[in-house]
Structure formats: structure tokens, C-alpha cells
Amino acid sequence: MLLLADMDVVNQLVAGGQFRVVKEPLGFVKVLQWVFAIFAFATCGSYSGELQLSVDCANKTESDLSIEVEFEYPFRLHQVYFDAPTCRGGTTKVFLVGDYSSSAEFFVTVAVFAFLYSMGALATYIFLQNKYRENNKGPMLDFLATAVFAFMWLVSSSAWAKGLSDVKMATDPENIIKEMPVCRQTGNTCKELRDPVTSGLNTSVVFGFLNLVLWVGNLWFVFKETGWAAPFLRAPPGAPEKQPAPGDAYGDAGYGQGPGGYGPQDSYGPQGGYQPDYGQPAGSGGSGYGPQGDYGQQGYGPQGAPTSFSNQM
């Protein structure tokens, strides 16, 4: 019963989740940040390496032709030592040089917290979208946290890149041999047999700077969610329409009044078109609807009738 109740809760969460956010840049980049953070702290925090060298004494019975030195994260090399022959009937402890734990641990810590934050932010995007956008506090806090992590990735990746360079120098068998007194004695021969494999550590630095790119790039997508970019994204106002000048369209050189009008002269002017002569008799004579003689003197009025009141007077 308890298992069924738990499954119901899970089903409700899944049903109420907004998984489409994973397809959007804001959520998709968070998934990449989550994955790349895992690679960053896994390749660095789980590292262990080994180097091998040999000491061939003049007295062959005291030689040690296979000295193996192991070291691992967090690279406190000053605590790593191995037994080397003195070629005088005994052995001595030889310690490596350097403590590079601070840069390595700082890098891994940033990666772990980035992993946790990415997972929490992604869960908030999916299941608590309304709470995330309430009062716009979620996007603003998300933007500030993203900016902080971007800066931390820059610092930690740069510090760890320098620390890794120092680790390589400190674990180089040739440099170790130079510091061994027995190797400076005449008749003794010291050789390096195997260098430590540091490809995993190189990968951790690459993932560190990839995380930096992801977090810096994600700043823009989170910034758009805050609404602070709205004033910058607003469309500029359109150009005002040009008002026609008085007399330009319907003025002195108006519609059909001359070369500035819209039609040929005499289209609707006083010299053409329908201009009845109210001085004619009841029939539309003179220059009415048709040419003279069509509806004029042979039309409705009698022939020989006066054509205007002026003729009668």
C-alpha cells in the first residue's frame, strides 16, 4: 500500500510537470550544465596515477630496478614517498614535492555545487514553474546564481589548470631523479620507466572551461526571464505618416483642374460632363444629356420655341 501511495505521488508530479521546458534553451542548457558538472568532478576527483623509475647501483646487489610511486586526488604530494636504495647497504625515504590540494578541491567543490544547483533548478523549471515566476523572484535569483557560478567556474578552472601543470612537473620521473642524492653518486644510474597518465586530468580542465562557456551563455537566457530586457527589446515607434499639403490634392490644382490633379482636364470640370442649363425649357435642351438636336429642339419642346428666357426678353 505504501508503495502504491508513493507511485501515485510520483504520477501526480509527472502529470503536473511542464517537461516542454527541457526543449527550450533555458531548460536544455541546464541539462547540459548538469551533465558536464558530473564529468568535471568525476574526472578530477576519482584520479589516481602511478610513475615508475629504477636505481641501478654500482653494487648490483643493492639496485632497485622497479620503483613504483602512486599518488591520487587531492594531490598532497608532499605526503607521498617511496623507498629508494642508498647503494650503501640501506634505503631512504624520498618524498615528492608540493601540495596542490587547494586548487583541486576547489575545482571539485564548484563542480559538485554546480551539479546540485543545476538539478534543483531543472526540477523547479519542470514542477514549480508557477512558483518560479511568482513576483519575478525566481528568475532574478536564478540570474544571480548563474552569474556567481560562471565566475566560480572561471576562477576554479584557471586555478586547477595551473595546479595540474605543477602536478605534472612534480610527478615527472626526470625531475624526481634530479632530486635524489643516490642518483648523483658516481657509478649509479637512475632511469625513468613510466610517466604517469594524466589524460583524465587534462579532460577535467577541458570540462571546467566548457562549463564556464555554458554558464556564461546561459546568463542571456536567464536574463530574458527576468524581464529586465523588455525595454531593450521593445519595437521602435513607426515613422509618422506624411500629411498632404493644403491645396495639393483637392486644392487649386485639384481633381481634374489642371496638371496637378488626378484626372485629365474637363473630366469633372465646368466645361464637360453633366452641366444642365436651367435656362432651358422643360425639356433638356442645349447642352444637356446629348448633342444639340438630340433631345433639344427636336426632343420634348416644340420647334421654334425660345431657347432661353433671355431670348424672350
UniProtKB/Swiss-Prot annotation:
GO MF annotations, alphabetized: cholesterol binding; identical protein binding; SH2 domain binding
Note on domains (UniProt): The calcium-binding activity is thought to be localized in the cytoplasmic tail of the protein.
InterPro entries reported in the protein's UniProt record: Marvel, Synaptophysin/porin
Region (Disordered): 238-313
Name of the protein described by the UniProt record: Synaptophysin
Low complexity bias locations: 264-281
Annotated positions of the Phosphotyrosine modification: 81
Source species: Homo sapiens
Membrane topology, from the record: Multi-pass membrane protein
Species lineage: Eukaryota, Metazoa, Chordata, Craniata, Vertebrata
Regions crossing the membrane: 26-49, 107-130, 138-161, 200-223
